[in-house]
């Protein structure tokens, strides 16, 4: 079990419209909070791109979305913190989070990022996603 640290969830090259799934960072059992950072290094073109960060409560069999960070056609960085200590008094619904939202109260033992883009980006556009786990 990793007790904390900063982990890369991927550096995604953005070109034609696509969905990309990053590598899994696992062995995070015991995490109580995660600060997520997504940075779009914008080149040119494109329409929209967003990163969804997911966690798993069943060793990667299924995934729960815990944050979504959205970008359009300019470089930017967005940061959000998700707490595993926030009580959930109602069941979270699996599915798509709305733009620029997060879901507190749910942190599993692994994370991954999924990046979805529309339009065609060019000029070495990259979306980088990091997680600081504690």
Language model features: what each stretch is:
Residues 1-134:
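Surface-exposed, low-hydrophobicity beta-strand/loop segments enriched in small/polar/acidic residues
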